[in-house]
Amino acid sequence: MIGLPLLLAACASTVPDLYTAPNAGFAAVSDQTSVAIGKRTAFAQTQAENEAIQREVRALVQGKTISADTAVQVALLNNKGLQASYADIGLSAATAWQEATPVNPVVSIGVLGIGAAELGAYRAIEGMIASNLLAAQTRQQRMALADVNFRAAQARAVDDTLALANQTRAAWINAVAAFETVSYLQRAKVTSDAGAELAQRLGETGALNKAGQAREFAFNAELAGQLAQARLNASRAKEELTRLMGLWGDDLSYFVPDALPAVPRNLRSVAGIEARALNNRVDLRVARLDLEAQAAAFGLTDRTRLVSDLELIAGIEAEREIEDGRKRTEASPQLELEFAIPIFDTGKARMRKAELSYLQAANVLAQKAVNIRSEARAAEAGYRATHRIAQHYRDVLVPLRATVEEEGLLSYNGMITSTFELISAARDRLGAELQAANAKRDFYLAEADLTAAIYGGGAGASASTATAALASAGDADH
């Protein structure tokens, strides 16, 4: 009886502040995000914090032409899906907090022989305190597993942050490129309208037959359809960017540039990209934590394989009786040990499940490392190739088409080249410029993919299963 309070006191311990703080674990997420992409993120939990973010977002977007960096910053502050991901960190911290808290003892009091007037209303009274010994024995293992899941939640939040940043940057690139395409097609349409009007006038004078007229009219009609489709694509691309930034209402009054920046002459350094990816990829860190969680779950399962419930019940019984005409109270201490007998369930099935879960996590980690190496190599190859292609269109094809048009204009002034030949040369130059714009878009998308290949958040990242380990172990403006 005297040892019971000592046992309960030994189980008690201080819960780490890391789990109990309102922003538990978020500082690590913010720091890692800043290192990877140089942007700030926030976890808003109060109305005042949300209002402060809204004011900052409005100042960044309303009536402004936003850059890619601004779009990414707005998304990291304002996307509610990302805020939900940050809440997972708090949930895992609360789980770890719960595991660090000792199980409450159960107190029971019973009164026997109620109504015995000669004994003062009752015959006996029992008081019992039950403490779960197995919970105390496995507490360190459960805390270790909960801590792994907490760190995995942090890593997943970083991965979600990088994924949103990469998606937003790609959406901005696509939106700007779409409006740039509209601009080129509008210029081509002006040239086409002139050709169609000339064909009509020549047809009226008999200088151009119906086949020639129809050819110019068909080209003009086809270009009108392409321009309408390009405008629709631009509207959709901007709407996707709006969704990722979490904007609505008055915040929609933002613009994107009319064209992407020129392709840089030199590429940034990508030396040792495989090693950099293996050192920095967040999804690989998540896979490692998955394996660590399964190892902790395996150890917990092993500790509880034969005895899954063990309780110590201690108490005292006070019984009244009348002897020689006098009431006498006799107190008797009691001690019980309660546990399940492993006759049918010997825990082998749970051990097998834990072993296979660990093997599964190990294979997932190994394959993830292979995939990351491949993604890094592919991203580097795409980055270099798209840069060469974009430079080819800009430095070779577009100047050649411009030369053809200039020479055609000189010939036209000398009455050697016909008007239709001059219009055709202008169309070809605009077509080359449109190809160059598309190649420029592909380069900037490849550059965004390169960052994702090094730090994470790209299409190759997959969701983690570490959170299941604890449960498995226990059971027209633009």
Where are these regions (language model features)?
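Periplasmic alpha-helical coiled-coil/stalk elements that build and connect Gram-negative outer-membrane
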Residues: 138-139, 148, 155-276, 379-382, ...
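Alpha-helical heptad-repeat coiled-coil segments that mediate oligomerization/polymerization in large
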Residues: 206-209, 372, 379, 415-419
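Small/polar, glycine/serine/threonine/aspartate-rich low-complexity segments that form flexible
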Residues: 54-64, 108-138, 142, 255-267, ...
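Membrane-embedded beta-strand positions in outer-membrane beta-barrel channels/transporters
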Residues: 72, 126-128, 172, 274, ...
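Terminal intrinsically disordered/low-complexity segments used for targeting and assembly
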Residues: 1-74, 231-276, 451-478
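Short segments within alpha-helical structural elements
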Residues: 222-250, 398-459
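A glycine-/polar-enriched beta->alpha junction
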Residues: 77-84, 90-105, 118, 127-145, ...
